[in-house]
Each structure stands twice: as C-alpha cells, then as structure tokens.
C-alpha cells in the first residue's frame, strides 16, 4: 500500500531510535493511510487518504 496521502501529500518521515545508552538506529514514521472510496471530480474512485484528511472533512466518502 502506498504510504502517501493523495489529498495532502503527507508521507513518511525518518529519524532515529535512541536507546537508554544513547545508541541511535534509523527508523521511519509512517502516516495512517486508509484506502477509501471517495467522490473525486464527480466520480467514485478508490484513493489513499490519511486519517486526518478523513476526519477534517477534506474527503467526500462515496456511499
């Protein structure tokens, strides 16, 4: 599944896990992407959307 929101273009962020002894290893933070049926430009399509866009009403869900 794609890890980019098709509405706001939110994607993965990278950084470090930091242990108690301050050793650092790389890690990624992934957005909560849901594949939903939505009305896009008058037609129903399946789009990958983050949950923040769903909650804020930026996506019109198809019935």
UniProtKB/Swiss-Prot annotation:
The keyword Ribosomal protein applies. Keywords: Ribonucleoprotein, Ribosomal protein. One of its GO terms (biological process) is translation. The keyword Ribonucleoprotein applies. Pfam families: Ribosomal_L28. GO terms for cellular component: ribonucleoprotein complex; ribosome. One of its GO terms (molecular function) is structural constituent of ribosome. Gene3D superfamilies: Ribosomal protein L28/L24. Belongs to the bacterial ribosomal protein bL28 family. HAMAP family: Ribosomal_bL28. This is Large ribosomal subunit protein bL28.
